[in-house]
Structure formats: structure tokens, C-alpha cells
Amino acid sequence: MRVLRVTFLWALLLLVAFSASVYAAEDEPKTPESTSSANPRDNDPVIQEIRGLRNSGMKLNDAKDFKGAIAKLRGAITLLHDRVFGEGREAITDPSDISQDAALYAQILNDYGTVLIRAKQYDEAIEVLEDSVAMVEKIYGDSHPSLGLSLRSLADAYMAKEEYKMAIKKYKTLRKHVKKGLETTHEAYIEASLRIAEGYKKLGNTKKNLKVLKDAVEAQNGEINGLTTGIAELYMELSTAHVAVGEIDDALRAAEVASAIFRQRDGEDTLSFAFSLNALAGVKMRQKKVDEAIKLLEQAHRIAVQIYGEKDPITQASAKTLREVKEYKLDLQAQKDEL
């Protein structure tokens, strides 16, 4: 059992590093909102100031200056709130301007909410994002992409606050919205399913965790499009869920599919593929197929060395895992020899 714990410890280390690379896209600089002067509204000094504050705030967010970002976005929201709900509204007579102001307000609320999440100010983030969702529904109805964006941010806020039941509820609403507009094979549907499953996993509900993942796989209608973002991760999580309930053969099949997709999608010399090999080795260990596990761990370790070098903590952890599994094999052999 000591070897199994170490094997999965390295899997966790790889997962942390892999997750950092996957979610790094969320931290990349956002494209500033266009300030094109295609219509008179774009030349409105208040709108220009609001956009300037918003863009400055998001740049500070990208630089991880959350305090500064919050201040800028609050400034934008204050100006826009007056224009949408306050005295400033009286000066707006064009119906299209009124609609665009409301849409911009909902967008900036969502931006503000995501910054608050990163700043770990979850209570205010939830309050702001609930308002954003309500505004988007009022403006666009329940079939607009903006609603999905706001719902996702709101669900993420509940998840970050560790209110998993509410997070699951919001992710389910998001998934229903995605299914209606984009169908079940879209990456957004898969991502929502993964987050729902994660919520159940956090709650310790292994059966519902497994069911959500199995249903998401079945929703792909028998097709495996390895290029769809999230498919490989879906099968990897499915393997882990099967292990959690003792369904090792099913876990092996899912892990093999995941590894094949990672290899095709990302290449052989990537962290994601190394992680999948390590997870596959963990399943092999549960099957007592130690030699096969060692081969997989050796391949994963070579990839880790190539990416990080010999001294990185991830590489050292993989080396330790490999060494201990080999020692475990020797112990087994010694026990057989004593019989």
C-alpha cells in the first residue's frame, strides 16, 4: 500500500503541474474591448472612460494586481450604474444605446466577479455574479452565449468557496444551457460535466461522481473526438472514478483511452501524456501487474526528465516512485523465494 500511495502522490504532483498549464489560458491577457468609433456612442466620453477603466482593470488582473484591478472595475461599474439605473439614464434616448449600456454593465459585472474570485473575495463575487446572470437573462433571454459565461463564473465562485452543492446546481444549469445551444459533444458540455463530477467528488459521493462521468461519455453518442477539449480529461477522471468504487477493469479501459488521446492530441513528450502513463501505471498496480507498471513509470519518468531536468521536484518524485515500485517487485520476489 505504501507503493500505491506514492504512485498516486506523484500522479497528484503531475496533476497540479498539468492543471497549471491547462488553466494558464485563464490568466493570459484578455483582449481589450474595442474602442472603435463606428457609431456616436463610441465617442461618448462616459463610455470611453468606462471602457478605459475596464481595460486598465483587466490588465491589472492579468498582472495579478487584484487590488488595483478591483478599484478600476469598481470605478467603471459606478459610472455605468449611474448611466443604466441612475440620473445619467435620462440623457440616453436611443433605445439601442440603452440596450448596449445594459449589456456592457452585465459584461463588466462578470469581469469584476472573476477578479473577485481570483482575489478570494468569494461572497462579493457571488453577489456580483448573481446580478450578472440576472441581467443577462433579462437582456438576452436564456439562449445567449453571454448567459453561459456568467453562469460559469458564478458556479466557479461557489466551487472556490467550497459550497459544492450550490456549485453543482449552477453547473447543471450551465450544462442544460449548453446542451440546448451547442449539444452534448461540445467542449463546454464536457467541461460542465467534469465540474459537476468534481463537485460530487468533493462531497465524497463516489457513485454520483461516477454516474456523471459515465453519462457524459455516453452523451458523445459512441464517438471519441480526441481533438475536442476535455475528452481526454473526461476519460482520465472516469478511470479514477472507477478505481474509487473498485471497478479496476473498467478503470483500465478508461485510462488506456485517455492515454491514447493525450498522446494523439498533445504528443509523446508532454506532461499530459506522462501524467496519463503514471495514472495507467497506478491501475496496473491495482491489478498486481507490477512489471507493466514499471515500464509505464519508466516512460513517464523519461518524459519528466526531458521536460524538467533531473532536479525538479516533479522529476525527483517520479524517480522515487519508480525506485519504490522496483523495490516492491524485489520484495515480492523475495517472498516467493522464501516459500
Curated annotation (Swiss-Prot):
Compartmental location: Secreted; Host nucleus; Host cytoplasm
Principal location: secreted
UniProt-listed Pfam families: TPR_10, TPR_12
Domain notes: The RxLR-dEER motif acts to carry the protein into the host cell cytoplasm through binding to cell surface phosphatidylinositol-3-phosphate.
Annotated signal peptide: 1-24
Species this protein is from: Phytophthora infestans (strain T30-4) (Potato late blight agent)
Protein task: Effector that suppresses flg22-induced post-translational MAP kinase activation in tomato but not in Arabidopsis. The perception of highly conserved pathogen- or microbe-associated molecular patterns (PAMPs/MAMPs), such as flg22, triggers converging signaling pathways recruiting MAP kinase cascades and inducing transcriptional re-programming, yielding a generic antimicrobial response.
PROSITE patterns per the UniProt record, alphabetical: TPR_REGION
PANTHER family from the UniProt entry: TETRATRICOPEPTIDE REPEAT PROTEIN (AFU_ORTHOLOGUE AFUA_6G03870)
UniProt-listed SMART domains: TPR
Gene3D superfamilies: Tetratricopeptide repeat domain
Keyword terms: Host cytoplasm, Host nucleus, Repeat, Secreted, Signal, TPR repeat, Virulence
Superkingdom of the organism of origin: Eukaryota
Residue stretches of each TPR repeat: 106-139, 190-223, 232-265, 274-307
GO CC, any one term: extracellular region
Recorded family membership: Belongs to the RxLR effector family.
Motif segment (RxLR-dEER): 51-74
InterPro entries, sorted: TPR-like_helical_dom_sf, TPR_rpt
The protein's name in its UniProt record: RxLR effector protein SFI4
